[in-house]
Amino acid sequence: MESGHRFDAQTLHSFIQAVFRQMGSEEQEAKLVADHLIAANLAGHDSHGIGMIPSYVRSWSQGHLQINHHAKTVKEAGAAVTLDGDRAFGQVAAHEAMALGIEKAHQHGIAAVALHNSHHIGRIGYWAEQCAAAGFVSIHFVSVVGIPMVAPFHGRDSRFGTNPFCVVFPRKDNFPLLLDYATSAIAFGKTRVAWHKGVPVPPGCLIDVNGVPTTNPAVMQESPLGSLLTFAEHKGYALAAMCEILGGALSGGKTTHQETLQTSPDAILNCMTTIIINPELFGAPDCNAQTEAFAEWVKASPHDDDKPILLPGEWEVNTRRERQKQGIPLDAGSWQAICDAARQIGMPEETLQAFCQQLAS
């Protein structure tokens, strides 16, 4: 498959679902995982899309990822619930966690959901969008257990994960305002994408094993490994630390330290503490009008008419619209890695080639 090819999202979804069915996932699990990965690519976040499949296959083959498992309730107290993800697909455990949180927010006006010991939960904005679709605000603190990739401010090596932070605010008859980013300068997955493409990452994102700044993504993909830096120096570091504590420790999970280090970079275990709020709880009748007035005010001052000011989440909306029409782009290296993973789990070559023909058409 040549570099720069674009894939039809629906056909690609069928292929990805078939890959996980081949791995042994039940139909609903395979669908939930494919839904999430394709949605990440459509939103423009290829780092959290189908390029994760080889890592998931390795994690499963190493005994870390547990297929056909579900989130288990550890403690429930009114509007709060703690869940053990049981190393299930994060796309399953987080879906179940958000569904339960939304149900509690309907009942109580507010809910707190603590999820620990889940396999990789992917793009956090997806779970925020699930809450926004129900009409709720949500705030998410996420940690990555035992796979340090990010150096603290003034640090010389990795001490914690990319620890995403996410907030969503639903709007009436419009797309939700969505803040969703890793607390590292760039997501780890973006170094994988750059590495496959053979392109550098922006300055200020990486240091090598000796602590020297670099733009070469190979330092995060090949031994000896370097480190990501936090965004905005001390500010990103402080937010990452709070995500580690609120996402990891408060959820009943673990934080990253000597005793919790993982032996495999594919054993991606996430913890997430989520606050879900019904905006009607506050009795603010002008909330939507004030939100729209602010949005119009901000967007009315572009420096360059060819570069409009975007609201939080608007870039994803635009990218989704474009990719739904033109297809999902995928570089040759990522596609080859996905095909190799499909072969590794036993997908017959004729089945793989049949999908390749459909995707190439």
Swiss-Prot record:
Record-linked SUPFAM superfamilies: L-sulfolactate dehydrogenase-like (SSF89733)
Keyword Oxidoreductase: yes
Amino acids binding NAD(+): 48, 122-124, 178-182, 234, 270, 313-316
Reactions catalysed, as given in the entry: 2-hydroxyglutarate + NADP(+) = 2-oxoglutarate + NADPH + H(+); 2-hydroxyglutarate + NAD(+) = 2-oxoglutarate + NADH + H(+); 3-phenyllactate + NADP(+) = 3-phenylpyruvate + NADPH + H(+); 3-phenyllactate + NAD(+) = 3-phenylpyruvate + NADH + H(+)
Keyword set includes Coiled coil: no
GO CC annotation, single: cytosol
Superkingdom assignment: Bacteria
Keywords, ordered alphabetically: NAD, NADP, Oxidoreductase
Name of the top EC class for this enzyme: oxidoreductase
Family stated for the protein in its record: Belongs to the LDH2/MDH2 oxidoreductase family.
Job of this protein: Catalyzes the NAD(P)H-dependent reduction of 2-oxoglutarate, phenylpyruvate and (4-hydroxyphenyl)pyruvate, leading to the respective 2-hydroxycarboxylate in vitro. Shows a preference for NADPH over NADH as a redox partner. Do not catalyze the reverse reactions.
Protein name: Hydroxycarboxylate dehydrogenase B
Gene name as annotated: hcxB
